[in-house]
Amino acid sequence: VDRLVGSEMCIRDSSHTVDYGFDDGQWTILENGDRIWRILISSPGAISLNFIFDDFYMPKGGSLYLYSDDKSDLLGAYTSVQNQDSGMLGTWLVYGEKVWLEYYEPAEVIGEGRLHLSNITHGYRNPKKKQQKDLNESYDCNHDVDCDIGDDWAAQKDHNKKSIALVLMNNSLCSGALINDTSNSGTPYILTADHCMDSSDAITAAYLFGWISPITSCATYSNSQSGPMGMTVSGSTLRASDPDSDLSLIHI
């Protein structure tokens, strides 16, 4: 892969409408007939880049990876699992001002994949920068998840930690939480705010999970640190919303 050379596209706005597809970038045919398409997206000074595809379809065996030019940050593989009826997909952040898009297509499905990039967001703030939280920085209503509030809390707190998500809609961030339904079906519903998104935002939203605090003791006298910025999911459907209560129910 290091020997492959792609085309470089340069953007400069914070959120930019683009028109990039397989006619851009570069194809490389492998010895077994499989092929790889690559394109390098450059946005000078960007802390991160994230992407919206308005035509996304991965055939069986096809996969898409996004990674920084220095290979320190990686998203993927995006596969047929991420195919949606809308044909759209939004990604999480890739850190760096240069990001490679790399699509792999097996010989038996040549020409079946579709990939069209319609929007690129130039990130100018780093959500990872302030990982250290000062003592007494939280509000009174914020409960330390590692402090027990009942006999059964120890069994529940890890589930609560894992349910919290950051929600990325193009160039804005919100928070949300996984909730269950009354039939305990395990359907992945996210509860977030109505002001965060509409139906089109939900289609291209990306979700970050894995907010598990490395500090597991209650009320320590040292600063706390956020968990890893990993484990992302892309694509969802707006199931219900209510502006009066500022509620949105999302199915991921």
What are these regions (language model features)?
Residues 1-6, 11, 250-251:
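Single conserved hydrophobic/aromatic residue that forms the stacking wall/gate
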Residues 24-33, 169:
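Extracellular beta-rich ligand/substrate-recognition surface
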Residues 32-41:
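Short beta-strands within extracellular/lumenal beta-sheet-rich domains
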Residues 44-50:
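Extended extracellular/luminal ectodomain segments enriched in beta-structured repeat modules
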Residues 56-62, 198-199:
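Extended, low-complexity, turn-rich repeat/linker tracts enriched in Gly/Pro/Ser/Thr and Asp/Glu
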Residues 59-72:
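Short, surface-exposed beta-strand/strand-loop-strand elements in extracellular ectodomains
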Residues 76-96, 106-109:
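Beta-sandwich interaction modules
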Residues 94-250:
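Serine endopeptidase catalytic core focused on the charge-relay Asp
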